[in-house]
């Protein structure tokens, strides 16, 4: 199973995170399948590669709580629901 979760980067006391698609059994700093975004909690900056995130979500990837909150703020789930509606019609 694949999860979308945070991978810690940066210096001590100055953490930044990559949002990655990674196998559930891998450790936090393990090898990821693909980098799908970036999150800096100190500067409150976020970059999301939305088409890639939608690709993984449509194939059953589960976001962690924090990644889900970040994605909601960016409106990823609204795009996911609109994409699914266009597929069925």
From Swiss-Prot:
- What SUPFAM superfamilies does the entry give? Ribosomal protein S16
Can you name the source organism? Glycine max
Top-level taxon: Eukaryota
UniProt keyword annotations, A-Z: Chloroplast, Plastid, Ribonucleoprotein, Ribosomal protein
Could you mention a single GO BP entry for this protein? Answer: translation
Pfam families in the record, alphabetically?
Ribosomal_S16
What the record says about family reads: Belongs to the bacterial ribosomal protein bS16 family.
Location(s), subcellular: Plastid, Chloroplast
InterPro entries assigned to the protein according to its UniProt record, in alphabetical order: Ribosomal_bS16 (IPR000307), Ribosomal_bS16_CS (IPR020592), Ribosomal_bS16_dom_sf (IPR023803)
Which Gene Ontology molecular-function terms are recorded? structural constituent of ribosome
**Name of the gene encoding the protein in the UniProt record:** rps16
A single GO cellular-component term from the record reads: small ribosomal subunit
Spell out the protein name for this chain: Small ribosomal subunit protein bS16c
